[in-house]
Structure formats: C-alpha cells, structure tokens
C-alpha cells in the first residue's frame, strides 16, 4: 500500500521518472545501429594458395592436404572445407560463435607458417588468408568500364588503388576484383620457328629470366661524392623484350621476336566480366563477419567521391549492386507497422473506456515503455533490426495490457463512487499482484530462449531481451505512472447499477450478458468441455506433425545470385558466350534492374551472376516468382545451366554452392564417392520436392593423358623433368619472370601461341632438346589418349567430399525436402563407406527441429515454476496453463490456412502465445481466489463471478494484443516475409484461445478444485493412537 501511495501522492517525482526513462530511450534510439537482423554471422576465414598449371588432384594432395593438417589443429574450428581446381586451392574455416575473428586469424597465419615447409616449390607466393566468407553475397558491387582503357589496365587500377582504399574502410572484410587479371608481358612461342632455329622452350625461358633481373649494384664514392649505381637490367614492356637475343644459330643471333609474338596483355586471358552487356571490371565487396552491413555500406558511399576523384576521366565508376536500400525499406516498413500497432491499440482502449481522459493514460504509458526500451537495447549492444522492431510491435499489445488492467480496475471503483486518489490506491492494490504475475510469467517464457545456444539462440536473443525489457518497463510504469495519472486525471461518478449503454458499451453489455448465459450452460455440462479440451490437445499433436516446416522464411531482398555450370569440357571462349547469352535473357526480364557477371580463372566451366531487381513497388512478382519465370527461359540454353537463388540475410556455412541448401557426401574412399555421387544426384533430381539439383563434383572434364616410355627416354637422353617442363612451358601460362613497377609487380607469361595449340595435333609439333643438343619430338617417347579428369577436388575435414545443392520448388517446405532426401538415401542402399548429411542452412534447420519441442516444453515448465512460486500452489498454475492448447491450435490452423510453413518466426509466435493467453486465466483465477477467501463464495460462484467481472479487461487486453499484431499480418512491401508469419501465428492463436478459454478455464478451475478437495479428504483421516 505504501509503495503505491508513494507514487500516487507525489506526481511531480513520478512524472520526472517517466520523463527520464523517455529521454534515455530517445538518446539510445539515436545511437542504435541499423541492421537487417541480429548479428549471427559465424567467424569465417578463407585461405588461398596457387600453383599455376597444377591439376586439381595435384593441388589437393600437395597443397590442400598439408595446409588442412596444420589448420585442423586450430582451436574452435567448427567446419573446414576445401576446394582445389586447376592451379588453385581454397580452404574455408568456419569457427564457433564465441571465437574472436582476429585471434583466429593469428592462429591461421601460424598454421600456414608451420605448413610452409611441406608445400611444393614453384608456388609464386605464400598462401594468404582473408577474413570474409566467400559464399556470402557481396554487400556492394562496383563496376569499372571504359571506352579507351583495356580490361587489363582497368583491373590493375581497380586492384592496385581502388581495392586497397576500399579495404581500409571499417567493416570491409574482402574486396574481390574480377573480370580480368593484372597486366603482363605475354610471350607466345612459334614451335616451328623454334624447331628451325634449334631452340628449346627452356632455353627461351632461361634467357628471358636472365635478361630481366633486379639486383643491388652498390655505390661508388670518393672523398667528396657518392654515386649510386643504376643499370638497365630490367625489361618492362613487350617492345623491350622483342629484340632480346635468346640463341645463336651458326653465328647468327636469334631474337625473341623471331620465334614468338610478344605483347602487352594480362596474366590470365581466360577471364571475363560484364555489366549490362558491357565489358567491365567488378569490385565485389564483402563485410567482416562481425561488421554492421548498413554502417559498412554508408562508409563505402561516403568514400565514393574520393574514389571518383582518383580515377581518370576515361573510366566510369558505377554502383551495380547495393544491399542496403531494401534493408532500409524493410526497417521503415516495420517502423510504420509499429506506429500503426500503437494507434490501433489506443483506439481499442478508447472504444472500451469511451473517455478521452482515460484513454490518454495508456496513450502515455505505451510510448514511455516502448521508447525506454531503446536505452536498454543500446546498453546491450543491440541494433534496430527486423526482429527487435517486431518485438516492440508485439510488445505494444503487452505493455498496454498492464495499463488496461490497472486502469480498468480503478475505473470500476470510480464508477462505484469512490474518490479518485482512493480509487487509484485501492484499485492498484487489488490488481498489483495480478499485474506482477502476468509480467513475470510472460518474461519467464523467454528464459529458455536466452539460454538457447547456436545460431537460433543468437538470432532470437535480441527479440527475447527487447520484449522482456519492454514488459519490465511496462510493469514499472503501470504500477507508478498509470495509477498516479488515474488519481489526478479521472473523476469519480455517481454509483449506478448499470453502465451507460451507448455504442460499444451497449455491445459490450450484450456480449457480457450472452457470455454469462452461455457460461452457466457450460458449467452444467463440464464433461463436454473436457472432451473439447482433450480434443484440442490431440489436434495440437497432429497439426504439429503434419504442418510443413522450414528454418527461416524465404526473403525477397531484391537481389538474386546465380551460378553457371556448363559442360565440363567447355572452352573459355564458349563459356564467355554462355555468360553473354544468360545475361541477355535475364536483362530482358521486365522485373530486372541490373545484371553483372564474370567467368574464367581456375574454373573455366563456371561463372557467377548478380541480379538486382526493381524495387517492390515497381514490380508485381516476388523474387521466387521471378526465378520460376526465368527458370523456364534459361532452360532453353544448351550446354549450360544457370541456377538462380534469392539472396538471404541469413546464410550458414562457407560452401559456395549454386543453390540455397546443401547435402554433403563424405567418404575416405575417393573411388566410392565418385561411384555413388552420380547415382545419388540422379535419384534426388527426380524428386518433385527438389529443384535445381546440382553438384560440385565435376570429374568428367576432358583430359589428355600422356604416357612416357621411360626406356626410350633414357636411350634418347631425356628425363621426365625436361618433358614436364616442356608441357608446362607450352600450355601452362607459365610465369617466368617478374617486372617491378612503383605501384605493383607484374609477370612475364610464356606459352606456345594459342594459334598453334587449337587441337590435339599440337602435341606432335612439340620437341625436347636432349643432352646431346638434338631436338627430339614428343611423339618419339610418349603416347597420349583422351580420358576424363576432375575439374575440382573437394574435402571436408580430411575426407573427400561432394556437395549436392538444391532449391525448393514453390509450395514445398524444407522439412518436406529433407524427409524426401532421407527416404531416398535409405532406399538407395548407400554403403557405409559413403556418409551423407545436411550442411549449411539445412543442417541448422535439422538441429533446430530437434530442439523446438524441448524449447516449448522448457518455456511452459519455466512459466509453471514461476506461477508456483507466486501462487504457492501446485494446482492453480495448471489451471492457468490449460489455456495453451487452444492458442497453439489456433496458431497452427492459421498457418495452414495461409499456406505458411512453421518456421523460427512462427516458433516465436507460439512462445509469445504462451505468455499472452495465460493472462486471461490469471485474471480469472486471481479474482476467483480472492472471492473465495474474502467473500465466502463457493468455487462455482467465485469463478462465475470472476469471469463476468473480468470479461471487460479480458476482452480489452485480448483485442489490444490482436490489433497490435494485426498490422504484421496485413503488412506488405519489403520484409513482409518475416513479419507475416509472426502476425498470423499470434492472431490465429488469440482468436481461437478467446473463443475457447473463456469456457475451458472455469471448467478446469473447478475440476482441479474438486480434485484438491478429494485428496484433502483422503489425507484428513483421523489418526489412530497405538
């Protein structure tokens, strides 16, 4: 009593406390960062190594394996995968959530250093690492185009100057430059001219390397001066290399230009990048795992004027893709939804109370509670994101509940003629325990979420804490500011036996009377209600098993990512044509705004595309509908496939796959894996629950297998090293020398001119100079035959791995897809030497599915314990929790009605319903117990009176929660995929629970009361003295 009186009779102090809470909240709101979702990125580090010309199998055994053995010893590694292709190896290390990315980077560097002695010689550089996930979609893509600059010069400028500057911006983890390669001097040899002059390829290589050196020459000094010695020991352009003497034939000088075409070109001519049908250099910017995407993008945009000032006038720098506009639009939609929810909730209160003054009280209490929450969010290091703002939207219905319960009870005393301050004190005292019980039991629902580990726990933590803080502040405001305002703003009225019957008041009285009549009938037919109650429990179980499930709602971020997979024997020239064809098909779609793409490098038969869609307001279709439409057109392109997927704000794992979900096959036997992977992929491709099934196992690339006759080689004076060097010099784009420039280092690349290597007959023109100086054709000591070879070799851990990626057809859930895959694997009878498991998002989904029921049970158990403590009873908490089955049935039925799968967002809705619907029972049970204790009523009379007296606040709180969630259901625009499942779950659960719990709760109350009395009689037998 004294506690409440302290705030009621000291209005100035109470107002100042509320003002302080509001001001702190406003300050916190201004300081909070903005993000699409809470920070849930796994720390990921990518290690890269190269050995030009080495086959995928050579890269896997000689480069990847030694690095994996060393990197695998690092503490906190959650998953290690690698992919080796022609001349390149990439190892992805995914660490646990609690691993600091900088500390992990130091361990990675130490592991690379430890493995250095085990790596092969000839590597142009040491392995390097980057603190970024290559499977993540870039947060921004910049393009460079020019009418006068070559692609090589553009690439050089982009990688040497622009990429370095962008990488220094806070939050940027990696700047990947694609579309070409660094400038180089390319030497294209004429094998016939070399043969005529008697010059070997190794002789050319050694001559070039010896002619281009950079060594210290020292200095000359006398007693007065000092002269630094400088020589023309470097050759920097093609024109300087052409006259280089490489051999003397009968006293005549043979110059490089006589036997080769020497041009200023690029290191790797098998690269191409495009933007909207124009050749372009792409700068693909990815953020650090712990960085905020909006802050990082803002930092890049702020740097753009400086970048544009750096570039020459002949270069055009454009933003081809930016992830931030849709994120900002989504957050703006949530903020508007929050404002609408607050307005609707206040409208509900006004319709019930029919008083401007009375409505003003919750109209003040709700904003104070919500705004004050921002201060706590800032102190906790949270952000303004879709989930935290949705928590505040839902909290609107919660925080007004506390104010409604207090206000309605005070208003009841005022209507009975009590003075305002006395009514405020008496009314608050009566419902103080009820409000505390409601709030604490609601917060208790989220305790299991706060203790939940893994990605789901990280994802939901901000939601749970934000909502709990809002409820806590609301509890304080409802017991301090609300009664104070009631006592000083509301006026007492003359006692009247019947309320005024106007408008909503008349409807409410009619509803209350009808409810009273129906409740009497129900209390006389309790067995029928019991059957209905048990039926809802059974229906819950059936619906939960039957409803389709997924991990997270499929988002429409306005960005698509596509992976091209062509025939494994395709040439680079043909692959570049496929890229252009696919880009034209996509660019012609009316919903597409921008298309960029690239191909080449170590994976000639693959490419990547990034598509920016028009804003949601300018297109009718969702991203998935656009993908379905494009899939039909793209399927007509022969010799290649383009797999499209919508970019999501959550992507798990470091695998770069051509679809959203992955199923990984592991084996310690590479032949077994290569035998079973095609069978499994074929079976999965036939499943209607899967779409775009593809695999990263590519072992059907064309290979020319050369077989040396070692006896003949020995007789001819040729060793294997000389023969291999011939092949590397001829076909390997061998980097034979380095050109040092002030801003960068460039290579001299030697190969046989591609004009002479158009087909297999080129091997017949190759020759080796033996120990006697004679030219021996390759065909004298080698035979060749075509064969198949892998284009890539993949590992997970130290096991051979192959990942089958897939998308979901429209109308199919992830649970249906995973069940179909597991069923197919069982039917195929895959041997134990080949193990299959889901990876990435599909793996997290399965882990979440296993913990969902445990989480719900834990939430119910926590609420039960809290209610036990508050009521000092084992029975009454069960009465209160009996409201839950009807709410969950309503939620699951609503999801089925709207064809929405049960996702992590729907799980949040179920958890919220556990907290919402029990409020009705708490209000009934509290008043019934008080009526039995103080009024001397029977249980039947007490619960009947409690139901009628609390009918108005129950209707008000339920409708407030319902209208608070309704804007989530009706919301459209960006981010609605996240909001709608939450709104559907809550609205469906509230409607069903309101229809049933008004009747089931009093029946359950009486059942447990009779049960309690029965046990009391059994335990009250007279004691017989012995």
Curated annotation (Swiss-Prot):
It is found in: Cell inner membrane. The keyword Cell inner membrane applies. InterPro entries: AcrB_DN_DC_subdom, Acrflvin-R, Multidrug-R_MdtC. Gene3D superfamilies: Multidrug efflux transporter AcrB pore domain, Multidrug efflux transporter AcrB pore domain like, Multidrug efflux transporter AcrB TolC docking domain, DN and DC subdomains, Multidrug efflux transporter AcrB transmembrane domain. One of its GO terms (cellular component) is plasma membrane. Pfam families: ACR_tran. GO terms for molecular function: xenobiotic transmembrane transporter activity. The chain crosses the membrane at residues 15-35, 333-353, 360-380, 387-407, 431-451, 463-483, 528-548, 853-873, 897-917, 953-973, 984-1004. It comes from the Bacteria. It is a multi-pass membrane protein. Keywords: Cell inner membrane, Cell membrane, Membrane, Transmembrane, Transmembrane helix, Transport. NCBIfam families: PRK10614.1, RND_permease_2. Belongs to the resistance-nodulation-cell division (RND) (TC 2.A.6) family. MdtC subfamily. Part of a tripartite efflux system composed of MdtA, MdtB and MdtC. MdtC forms a heteromultimer with MdtB. This is Multidrug resistance protein MdtC. It comes from Salmonella paratyphi A (strain ATCC 9150 / SARB42).
């Amino acid at each position: 009593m004294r506690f409440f009186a302290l705030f009621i009779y000291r209005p100035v102090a109470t107002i100042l406390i509320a003002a302080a809470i509001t001001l702190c909240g406003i300050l916190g709101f201004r300081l909070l960062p903005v993000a699409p979702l809470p920070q849930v990125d796994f720390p990921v580090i990518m290690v890269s190594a190269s050995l030009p010309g080495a086959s995928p199998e050579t890269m896997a055994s000689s480069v990847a394996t030694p690095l994996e053995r060393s990197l695998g010893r690092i503490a906190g590694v959650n998953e290690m995968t690698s992919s080796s292709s022609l001349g390149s190896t990439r190892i992805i290390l995914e660490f646990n959530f609690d691993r600091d990315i900088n500390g992990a980077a130091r361990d990675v560097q130490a592991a690379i250093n430890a493995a250095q002695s085990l790596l092969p010689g000839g590597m142009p550089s040491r392995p390097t690492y980057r603190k970024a996930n290559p499977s993540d979609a870039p947060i921004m893509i910049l393009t460079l185009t020019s009418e006068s600059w070559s692609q090589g010069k553009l690439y050089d400028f982009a990688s040497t100057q622009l990429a370095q500057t962008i990488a220094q911006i806070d939050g940027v983890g990696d700047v990947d430059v694609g579309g070409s390669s660094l400038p180089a001097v390319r030497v294209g040899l004429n094998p016939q001219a070399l043969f005529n002059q008697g010059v070997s390829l190794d002789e050319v290589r050694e001559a070039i390397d010896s002619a281009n050196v950079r060594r210290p020459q020292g200095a000359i000094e006398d007693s007065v001066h000092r002269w630094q010695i400088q020589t023309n020991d470097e050759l920097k352009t093609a024109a300087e290399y052409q006259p280089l003497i490489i051999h003397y034939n009968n006293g005549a000088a043979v110059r490089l230009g006589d036997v080769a075409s020497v041009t200023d070109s690029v290191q790797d001519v098998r690269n191409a990048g495009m933007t909207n049908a124009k050749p372009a250099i792409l700068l693909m910017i990815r953020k650090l795992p712990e960085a905020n995407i909006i802050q990082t993008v803002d930092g890049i945009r702020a740097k753009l004027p400086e970048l544009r000032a750096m570039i020459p006038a002949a270069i055009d720098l454009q933003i081809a893709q930016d992830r931030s506009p849709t994120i900002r639009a989504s957050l703006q939609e949530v903020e508007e939804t929050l404002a609408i929810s607050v307005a609707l909730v206040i409208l509900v209160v006004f319709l019930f109370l029919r008083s401007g003054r009375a409505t003003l009280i919750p109209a003040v209490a709700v904003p104070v509670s919500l705004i004050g929450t921002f201060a706590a969010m800032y102190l906790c290091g949270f952000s303004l994101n879709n989930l935290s703002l949705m928590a505040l939207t839902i909290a609107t219905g919660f925080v007004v509940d506390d104010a409604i319960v207090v206000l309605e009870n005070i208003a009841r005393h005022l209507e009975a003629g009590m003075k305002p301050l006395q009514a405020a004190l008496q009314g608050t005292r009566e419902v103080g325990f009820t409000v505390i019980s409601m709030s604490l039991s609601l917060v208790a629902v989220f305790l299991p979420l706060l203790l939940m580990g893994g990605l789901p726990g990280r994802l939901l933590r901000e939601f749970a804490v934000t909502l709990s803080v809002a409820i806590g502040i609301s509890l304080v405001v409802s017991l301090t500011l609300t009664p104070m305002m009631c006592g000083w703003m509301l006026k007492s009225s003359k006692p009247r036996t019947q309320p005024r019957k106007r408008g909503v008041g008349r409807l409410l009285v009619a509803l209350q009377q009808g409810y009273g009549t129906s409740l009497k009938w129900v209390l006389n037919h309790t067995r029928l209600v019991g059957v209905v109650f048990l039926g809802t429990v059974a229906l819950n179980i059936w619906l939960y098993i039957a409803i389709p499930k997924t991990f997270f709602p499929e988002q429409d971020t306005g960005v698509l990512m596509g992976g091209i997979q062509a025939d494994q024997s395709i040439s680079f020239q043909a692959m570049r044509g496929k890229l252009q064809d696919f880009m034209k098909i996509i660019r012609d779609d009316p919903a597409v705004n921008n298309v960029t793409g690239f191909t080449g490098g170590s994976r000639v038969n693959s490419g990547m595309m990034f598509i920016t869609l028009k804003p949601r307001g300018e297109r009718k279709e969702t991203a998935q509908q656009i993908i379905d439409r494009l899939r039909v057109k793209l399927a007509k392109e022969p010799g290649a496939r383009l797999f499209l997927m919508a970019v999501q704000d959550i992507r798990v794992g470091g695998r770069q796959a051509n679809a959203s979900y992955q199923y990984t096959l592991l084996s310690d036997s590479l032949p077994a894996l290569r035998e079973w992977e095609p069978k499994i992929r074929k079976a999965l491709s036939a499943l209607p629950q899967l779409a775009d099934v593809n695999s990263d196992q590519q072992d059907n690339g064309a290979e020319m297998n050369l077989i040396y006759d070692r006896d003949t080689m020995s007789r001819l004076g040729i060793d294997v090293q000389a023969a291999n060097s011939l092949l590397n010099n001829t076909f390997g784009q061998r980097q034979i020398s380095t050109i040092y420039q002030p801003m960068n280092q460039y290579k001299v690349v030697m190969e046989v001119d591609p004009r002479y290597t158009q087909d297999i007959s080129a091997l017949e023109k190759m020759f080796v100079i033996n120990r006697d100086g004679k030219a021996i054709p390759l065909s004298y000591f080698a035979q060749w035959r075509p064969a198949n070879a892998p284009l890539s070799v993949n590992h997970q851990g130290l096991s051979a791995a192959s990942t089958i990626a897939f998308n979901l057809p429209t109308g199919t859930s992830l649970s249906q897809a995973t069940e179909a895959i597991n069923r197919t694997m069982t039917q195929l009878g895959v041997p134990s030497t080949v193990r299959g498991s889901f990876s990435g998002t599909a793996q997290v989904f399965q882990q979440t599915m296993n913990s969902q029921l445990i989480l719900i049970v834990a939430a119910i158990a926590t609420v039960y314990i809290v209610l036990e403590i508050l009521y000092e009873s084992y029975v009454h908490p069960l009465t209160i929790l009996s409201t839950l089955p009807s709410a969950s049935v309503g939620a699951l039925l609503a999801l089925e009605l709207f064809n929405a799968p049960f996702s992590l967002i729907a799980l949040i809705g179920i958890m919220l319903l556990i907290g919402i619907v029990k409020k009705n029972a708490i209000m009934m049970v509290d008043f019934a117990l008080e009526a039995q204790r103080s009024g001397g009523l029977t249980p039947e009379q007490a619960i009947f009176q409690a139901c009628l007296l609390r009918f108005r606040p129950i209707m008000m709180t339920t409708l407030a929660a319902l209208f608070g969630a309704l804007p989530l259901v009706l919301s459209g625009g960006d981010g609605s995929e996240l909001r709608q499942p939450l709104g559907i779950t809550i609205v469906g659960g509230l409607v069903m629970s309101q229809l049933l719990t008004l009747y089931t709760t009093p029946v359950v109350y009486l059942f447990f009361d009779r049960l309690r009395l029965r046990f009391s009689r059994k335990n009250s037998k007279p004691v017989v003295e012995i």
